[in-house]
C-alpha cells in the first residue's frame, strides 16, 4: 500500500527519486524557473518606477527610436497601435537657440552701400552728414544692420573714401564736433536709373583738369589786360564777359570766382626788383622770362583800338603763350649787367609828346638797351601812372635826363 507523498518546500531542490518499481523519477525544476521570472519582473518594474519618478510623472521612459512614449504603449506591446494617436502624442525635441535666431533675423536689404549712403545724405536737410550720422540712419531704417554693426561700418567708410561721387567737406571752425561732413558731388545725382536705388548706371568719375587748361581768373580782368590775353584780340570797349566755367568744375561756383584762386603764372610784383638786385643778378638770369606787366587803370578807347592792332602784329611774330624775354645790357662805366624793359606805345594822331607823356597802361612791352648813365627805375611804368596829368606837362625837352632816357629820346653812347 502506497502512502501519499509529502510535499516538500519548493526552495529545496529535489534530487533523484525512485518510484516503487525502482526507476529513477524526473526532477521538477519548473517551480524554480517561475520564481526567477517573477523576481526579474519585480526588479524591472522597480527600475522603471524609479526612472519614471526621476524624469516625468505619468510617463514611462522607453528607448524606442529615441522618443519618449506614454506608459500604455509600453504595456500594450511596446509599439503604437494607432498612427493618428501616435502623431498627436508625439513630441518633437526642442530646437537649438541658433536655429531660432536665424529664423527671426530679418532679410538683407537689396541696396548697395553706395545707395544706402546716398539715401542717408539726401534725407538730410543740409544734404551732408558725418560718418556716424550715416551709420545711425542705416541702422534705424534697416533692422538687418543692427546686429552686424562693426562689419558694415567699415564698408561704409571704405565706400566714402574710394568713390568719387562723395565729397568730403571739412568742418567749419565755429561748429565743434568730430569728423568731417560727406556730401554728394553735384554731377553724380543722376547715377541711378530713374531715381531707383536698386540699379546704378555707371561708376561716377570726377573730371580731371588737364595740365595745360586755362583756369578762370579769380577776379575780372580789365579790358586792356583781357586784350593781351585774348587769342583773337579786337576792339574791347566795354567790360569783359565773365569767364566761362571750366569743364569739370563745380557748377555751384559763382561766375568770376573759382573754388581755388590761382594767380598769374608770373606775377609782375614778384619781378619788379630794385636796382641793386638787378645789378647783382646771376648770369643764368640772362634768358629768364618776364611776365606780362600788370594793367594800369588809365586807358582811353582809341588807345585800346590801337592796342588791338599792335597785339595782332605782335602775336604773328610771337607764340600765343610765350612771355617776354629779357635783354642783357652791359654798361661801360660800371661793367654790370642790367636787365631793362622799355615800353613802346602807339602814338595817337596829333600827339607831339614822347613815350613818357603818352605812355598808357596798355603799352606793349618791347626790349631796348639802356644807356649807361641811367639806372633802371624801381618800378616799371612809374612815369606812366597817370596819362591825364602827364599830357599837361612840358614837352620832352623840359623833362629830366632820366625821363628822356626812358622815353627813348636820349641816344645811348654805345649800343651794348
From Swiss-Prot:
Localization per Swiss-Prot or TrEMBL: Nucleus
An example Gene Ontology biological process: regulation of transcription by RNA polymerase II
Organism annotation: Homo sapiens (Human)
Name assigned to this protein: Forkhead box protein D4-like 5
DNA-binding region per UniProt: 108-202
Acidic residues composition-biased segments: 30-45
InterPro entries documented for this protein: Fork_head_dom, FOX_domain-containing, TF_fork_head_CS_1, TF_fork_head_CS_2, WH-like_DNA-bd_sf, WH_DNA-bd_sf
Chain residue ranges for the region called Disordered: 1-55, 70-105
Compositional bias (Basic and acidic residues): 1-29
Keywords attached to this entry: DNA-binding, Nucleus, Transcription, Transcription regulation
GO molecular function ontology, one term from the record: RNA polymerase II cis-regulatory region sequence-specific DNA binding
UniProt keyword annotation of Transcription regulation present: yes
Gene3D superfamilies named in the record: Winged helix-like DNA-binding domain superfamily/Winged helix DNA-binding domain
GO annotations of cellular component type: chromatin; nucleus
Disulfide links within the chain: none
Amino acid at each position: 500500500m502506497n502512502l501519499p507523498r509529502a510535499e516538500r518546500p519548493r526552495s529545496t531542490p529535489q534530487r533523484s527519486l525512485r518510484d516503487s518499481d525502482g526507476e529513477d523519477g524526473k526532477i521538477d525544476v519548473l517551480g524554480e524557473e517561475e520564481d526567477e521570472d517573477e523576481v526579474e519582473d519585480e526588479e524591472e518594474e522597480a527600475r522603471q518606477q524609479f526612472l519614471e519618478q526621476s524624469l516625468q510623472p505619468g510617463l514611462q521612459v522607453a528607448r524606442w527610436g529615441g522618443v519618449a512614449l506614454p506608459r500604455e504603449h509600453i504595456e500594450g506591446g511596446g509599439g503604437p497601435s494607432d498612427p493618428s494617436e501616435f502623431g498627436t502624442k508625439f513630441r518633437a525635441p526642442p530646437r537649438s537657440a541658433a536655429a531660432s535666431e536665424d529664423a527671426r533675423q530679418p532679410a538683407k536689404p537689396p541696396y548697395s552701400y553706395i545707395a544706402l549712403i546716398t539715401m542717408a545724405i539726401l534725407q538730410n536737410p543740409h544734404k551732408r552728414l558725418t560718418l556716424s550720422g550715416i551709420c545711425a540712419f542705416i541702422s534705424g531704417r534697416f533692422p538687418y544692420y543692427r546686429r552686424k554693426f562693426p562689419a558694415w561700418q567699415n564698408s561704409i567708410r571704405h565706400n566714402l573714401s574710394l568713390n568719387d561721387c562723395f565729397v568730403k567737406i571739412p568742418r567749419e571752425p565755429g561748429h565743434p564736433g568730430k569728423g568731417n561732413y560727406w556730401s554728394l558731388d553735384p554731377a553724380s545725382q543722376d547715377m541711378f536709373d530713374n531715381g531707383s536705388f536698386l540699379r546704378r548706371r555707371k561708376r561716377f568719375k570726377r573730371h580731371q583738369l588737364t595740365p595745360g587748361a586755362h583756369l578762370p581768373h579769380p577776379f575780372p580782368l580789365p579790358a586792356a589786360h583781357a586784350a593781351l590775353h585774348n587769342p583773337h584780340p579786337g576792339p574791347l570797349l566795354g567790360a569783359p564777359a565773365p569767364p566761362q566755367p571750366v569743364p569739370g568744375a563745380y557748377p555751384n561756383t559763382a561766375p568770376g570766382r573759382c573754388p581755388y584762386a590761382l594767380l598769374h603764372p608770373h606775377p609782375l610784383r614778384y619781378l619788379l626788383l630794385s636796382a641793386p638786385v638787378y645789378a647783382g643778378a646771376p648770369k643764368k638770369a640772362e634768358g629768364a622770362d618776364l611776365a606780362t606787366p600788370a594793367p594800369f587803370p588809365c586807358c582811353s578807347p582809341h588807345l585800346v583800338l590801337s592796342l588791338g592792332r599792335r597785339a595782332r602784329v605782335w602775336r604773328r611774330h610771337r607764340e600765343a603763350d610765350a612771355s617776354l624775354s629779357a635783354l642783357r645790357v652791359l654798361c661801360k662805366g660800371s661793367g654790370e649787367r642790367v636787365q631793362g624793359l622799355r615800353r613802346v606805345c602807339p602814338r595817337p594822331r596829333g600827339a607831339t609828346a614822347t613815350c613818357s607823356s603818352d605812355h598808357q597802361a596798355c603799352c606793349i612791352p618791347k626790349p631796348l638797351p639802356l644807356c649807361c648813365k641811367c639806372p633802371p627805375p624801381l618800378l616799371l611804368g612809374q612815369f606812366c601812372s597817370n596819362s591825364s596829368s602827364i599830357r599837361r606837362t612840358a614837352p620832352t625837352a623840359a623833362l629830366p635826363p632820366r625821363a628822356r632816357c626812358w622815353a627813348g629820346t636820349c641816344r645811348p653812347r654805345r649800343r651794348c
